[in-house]
Amino acid sequence: MSFDNHLVPTVIEQSGRGERAFDIYSRLLKERIVFLVGPVTDESANLVVAQLLFLESENPDKDIFFYINSPGGSVTAGMSIYDTMNFIKPDVSTLCLGQAASMGAFLLSAGEKGKRFALPNSRIMIHQPLISGGLGGQASDIEIHARELLKIKEKLNRLMAKHCGRDLADLERDTDRDNFMSAEEAKEYGLIDQVLENRASLRL
């Protein structure tokens, strides 16, 4: 995750060995909180993957909390996060704050069943994968890329159908165009398990 260092607060902690300064995200990582903020890119995905692997090494039996505020982005980068979430031993609880769109929504749905949350004013959007950038070249190359895109679309729909507890036909229909949902609508659809009004409403 990339942030402007001038905008990231620093937390000072006192211990028997004196003072220690943490940027706020490193401090929250100690609480097993991982953030995905902004577009899903190779860089942001690598940082998330590294943090997930680190937290597993610290304690393989304790949940990890994955906070998502993302408009989506690269499918391959997102799938590296998805595969790591499934690869590691700890349960990964997901929470949407702000928005989870496209690959962000896919990752939100991929949290541990019963531990997928959204704050009440979050927006969730699902759709079919897009080709990033202009696609040019020979007709045969364009055909190859089109076939690959259809394979990716089918795979994402199958996986999301599994996570949402829905038929594949539902996902094929509902991702045909941009499909925006409120937190409550995302819960009804099966993308999340609970809308959190406040911390006291959390049920695990």
From Swiss-Prot:
Domain of life: Bacteria
Disulfide bridge positions per record: none
GO biological process: protein quality control for misfolded or incompletely synthesized proteins
One GO term describing the cellular component: cytoplasm
Record keyword Lyase present: no
The protein's Enzyme Commission number: 3.4.21.92
GO MF annotation: an example: ATP-dependent peptidase activity
CDD domains the UniProt entry points to: S14_ClpP_2 (cd07017)
UniProt entry keywords in alphabetical sequence: Cytoplasm, Hydrolase, Protease, Serine protease
Coiled coil in keyword set: no
Record's function text: Cleaves peptides in various proteins in a process that requires ATP hydrolysis. Has a chymotrypsin-like activity. Plays a major role in the degradation of misfolded proteins.
Known partners and oligomeric status: Fourteen ClpP subunits assemble into 2 heptameric rings which stack back to back to give a disk-like structure with a central cavity, resembling the structure of eukaryotic proteasomes.
Name of the protein in its database record: ATP-dependent Clp protease proteolytic subunit
Organism expressing this protein natively: Neisseria gonorrhoeae (strain ATCC 700825 / FA 1090)
